[in-house]
């Protein structure tokens, strides 16, 4: 890549009716620079995602900075911001910006989503080695503040397979990070803004995802989890493909212990399957209709959590098992018409317990489950 490269998209002029290929995946890199450099198709999508959750008070923040045609009716590229305070109350805004610029200069990446008319902007800056990331928010009357992510020592996992099935890529430039944030958030109803502070006990990370297709053509269902559990850090994205291809399961899941990558799963198994030729993930939902104290999503799927099992390759492969419980609703919005069979996208603050053999480490994370059909 040249010393300086700029990708500038204007929402009115850069959405193409033709297929626009993504730039190639760069092995061993965070792939932070834009994959759709000069234009993006009506179905293409790429995401810069940042999150953090406090193990002490379960406050959390989630930021999704998008390039896609999704915000067509609003005239801009979407930035989603979710926050949850220690007492469980939440804040969410979808913001739209007509201009998106990503710049690479000597390997240092900056991104700017901007509305010159209103003066609103959201930006991020990532150092060449992906060790430090800073986000800045300046949208008058809505959000003002910063978020910092600093990579934790140890393996990066960037040399592993990024494919999430045949149609999507996911790279974690900062899979494990300490996170701090301080923002002023306004509800827009003339009430005083609220101060949101995350840290210093918060962990999280940064993901990069891109696909040529809209999500209904990529998947029917997905689950996402990033959690720190004692010495373990885990990152999971598991989806089922669209119905026409048989709802096949795919994953990009990683498990670390004390900063060392110990399981890199791109294969999904059931408990009955015995294919131990590669690192694998077993992920099953948990249900409990008898208890009134559990937390579930508001839509068709009423699971109360998951059982996560990482399996190292080899017939004598090490196993690590974790139980995930939904603790708090972080976000919730529908993906279908309302009704008893309605589907949706729900974010959770997750409590996680487990480890290897008889270990029972405890931790917290951010989970997100989405059903489209």
Swiss-Prot record:
> If you read the UniProt record, what top EC class would you report for this enzyme, in one word?
isomerase
What EC number(s) does this enzyme carry? 5.5.1.-
Induction behaviour: Expression is positively regulated by the trichosetin cluster-specific transcription activator TF22.
Q: Does the keyword Isomerase apply?
A: yes
GO: which molecular function terms? isomerase activity
For this UniProt record, the keywords arranged alphabetically read as follows: Isomerase
Which reaction equations make up its catalytic activity?
Answer: (5S)-3-[(2E,6R,8E,10E,12E)-2,6-dimethyltetradeca-2,8,10,12-tetraenoyl]-5-(hydroxymethyl)pyrrolidine-2,4-dione = trichosetin
Membrane-spanning residues where? none
Top-rank lineage group of the source organism? Eukaryota
Q: Pathway involvement?
A: Mycotoxin biosynthesis
Record bears the keyword Disulfide bond: no
User: What phenotype has been reported when the gene encoding this protein is knocked out?
Assistant: Results in the production of reduced, though significant, amounts of trichosetin.
Protein's job: Hybrid PKS-NRPS synthetase; part of the gene cluster that mediates the biosynthesis of trichosetin, a trans-fused decalin-containing tetramic acid with antimicrobial activity. The PKS module of PKS-NRPS1 together with the enoylreductase (ER) catalyze the formation of the polyketide unit which is then conjugated to L-serine by the condensation domain of the PKS-NRPS1 NRPS module. Activity of the Dieckmann cyclase domain (RED) results in release of the Dieckmann product intermediate.
Q: Which family does it belong to?
A: Belongs to the Diels-Alderase family.
Question: Per its record, how is this protein called by name?
Answer: Diels-Alderase
Query: What is the protein's species of origin?
Result: Gibberella fujikuroi (strain CBS 195.34 / IMI 58289 / NRRL A-6831) (Bakanae and foot rot disease fungus)
Taxonomy of origin reads: Eukaryota, Fungi, Dikarya, Ascomycota, Pezizomycotina
């Amino acid at each position: 890549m040249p010393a300086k490269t700029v990708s500038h998209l204007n929402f009115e002029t850069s959405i193409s009716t033709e297929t626009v290929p993504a730039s190639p995946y760069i092995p061993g890199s965070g792939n932070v620079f834009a994959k759709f450099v000069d234009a993006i198709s009506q179905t293409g999508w790429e995401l810069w995602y940042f999150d953090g959750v406090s193990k002490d008070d379960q406050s959390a923040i989630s930021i999704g900075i998008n390039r896609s045609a999704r915000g067509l009716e609003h005239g801009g590229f979407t930035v989603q911001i979710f926050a949850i305070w220690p007492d469980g109350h939440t804040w969410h805004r979808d913001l739209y910006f007509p201009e998106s610029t990503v710049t690479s200069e000597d390997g240092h990446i900056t991104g700017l989503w901007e509305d010159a008319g209103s003066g609103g902007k959201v930006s991020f800056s990532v150092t060449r080695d992906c060790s430090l990331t800073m986000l800045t928010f300046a949208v008058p009357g809505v959000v003002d503040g910063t978020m910092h992510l600093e990579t934790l020592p140890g393996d990066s996992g960037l040399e592993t397979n990024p494919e999430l099935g045949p149609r999507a890529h996911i790279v974690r430039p900062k899979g494990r990070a300490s996170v701090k944030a301080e923002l002023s958030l306004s509800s827009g109803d003339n009430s005083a803004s609220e101060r949101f502070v995350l840290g210093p006990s918060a962990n999280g990370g940064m993901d990069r995802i891109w696909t040529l297709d809209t999500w209904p053509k990529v998947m029917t269902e997905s689950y996402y989890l990033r959690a720190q559990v004692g010495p373990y850090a885990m990152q999971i994205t598991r989806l089922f493909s669209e119905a026409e291809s048989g709802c096949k399961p795919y994953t990009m899941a990683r498990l670390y212990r004390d900063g060392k990558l110990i399981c890199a799963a791109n294969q999904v198994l059931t408990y009955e399957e015995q294919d131990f030729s590669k690192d694998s993930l077993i992920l099953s939902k948990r249900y409990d209709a008898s208890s009134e104290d559990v937390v579930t999503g508001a839509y068709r799927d009423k699971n109360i959590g998951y059982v996560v099992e990482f399996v190292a390759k080899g017939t004598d492969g090490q196993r690590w098992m974790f139980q995930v419980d939904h603790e708090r609703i972080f976000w919730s919005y529908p993906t279908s018409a309302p009704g008893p069979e309605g589907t949706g996208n729900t974010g959770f603050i997750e409590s996680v317990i487990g480890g290897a053999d008889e270990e029972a480490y405890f931790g917290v994370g951010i989970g997100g489950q989405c059903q489209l059909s």
